[in-house]
Regions:
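Active-site-proximal polar cores
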Residues: 1-21
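Short, conserved turn/kink motifs that form compact alpha/beta structural patches or helix kinks used as
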Residues: 19-102
Length: 102
């Protein structure tokens, strides 16, 4: 594994007044391996409203269902996963029409 990724999840917390709010929780940098997006994957992602950007593979035990990742300094949606034994493939993309605010 020759690259790193940060996985992001949300948790709902309560403040002192009992109001609920969402807070982001980021993992430490995790080792991953960069794969490639096939033409078929790109097409399927596009039909689902995503622009496919990357496929990364990491150890299955490092993944806990997060829906967002930070890869090479940019935030991506995890729009699909595929388990391969002890590893899992995460497919990263952006929503079609979404403007990057970073």
């Amino acid at each position: 594994m020759n690259d790193t990724i940060i996985l992001v999840s949300e948790e709902t917390l309560k403040d002192d007044t009992g109001q609920r709010y969402k807070s982001e929780v980021q993992t430490d940098e995790l080792l991953c391996e960069l794969g490639s997006i096939t033409r078929s994957e790109w097409s399927q992602a596009n039909q689902a409203g995503y622009e496919a950007e990357y496929e990364v593979e990491l150890f299955f035990l490092d993944y806990a269902g997060q829906r967002t990742a930070i890869f090479h300094g940019k935030r991506y949606a995890i729009y699909r996963t595929y388990r391969r034994g002890e590893r899992i493939e995460l497919y990263l993309g952006t929503r079609v029409g979404e403007i990057d605010a970073e």
